[in-house]
Amino acid sequence: MLTKFGFYGASCYDWLLYSAKVLKNCGMDVILIDMSENKSLSYAIPDIPGVKNQVIDYMGCSFATSIPKDAEDAYDTAFIYLGDTVNPSIHFDYTFCVTDCELHSMKPRIQLWEKITALDYAPSQKMICSSESGADEIDPDEEFTTDCPHLIILGPMAESKYRYIAGQYSVDSKSCNAVDLDEGNMDCRISCQYDTVVRFSKISDSFKDLITKLCFTALGDTRDYKNFKKAFKKAERGK
């Protein structure tokens, strides 16, 4: 059964690519779909200018600019990117709004999150989280439930800036994840835009946690912690 993850906002293509690679190594069939108006996710994937109404292979995962007719039967997980355009016609099992904490004004992104929050849908609530030290030490007993959609705030010192952001915009901490990024994240992000081999061993532990959380949610009851650690390490090396 296909699980649909909807992503709004920006600055998330590296998160989607890394997570898709890990899930592929776990034996899942994954498709990345860019339904944004400016096709910004497409720019992170080489050699696909003008791709329309077809599915191509990228690093063992599928990529398309629209939802294939056979998606429900052909894939386990779909990461669907919509940019800044809210699409109430698509039901997502999980919904995310991603923003950069270094934006001059976060108000437009918070307003987008509020629009998504107002949509009438019934997402799954249970998500699994890794320990704070990253994917090397996964605690199977650590889990939490939150209300969707999830607001993801990324950037340098995002965790320390979160309290100010929450105070300014009345953001509910239960549905928000603040994730610190550093120079290693930026290097890997630039690399995945231009290199055909995507490696991400230099990313921050907070970002590894975010990948782990997304992957565990997609895997659900099928996850195997030992195999997941191997799949994560393999994906980090670009395999």
Region roles according to the model:
Residues 2-14, 28-91, 107-110, 160-166, ...:
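P-loop/Walker-type NTP enzyme "switch/lid" segment
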Residues 10, 100-103, 205:
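Short, surface-exposed acidic/glycine-rich loop or hinge patches that mediate macromolecular interfaces
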Residues 19-28:
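A short, Lys/Arg-enriched amphipathic alpha-helix followed by its capping loop at the start of a domain
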Residues 67-68, 112-116, 206-214:
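Generic hydrophobic alpha-helical segments
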Residues 80-192, 198-199:
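Conserved catalytic-core segment of NTP-binding enzymes
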Residues 189-239:
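NTP-binding/hydrolysis catalytic cores, primarily Walker-type P-loop NTPases
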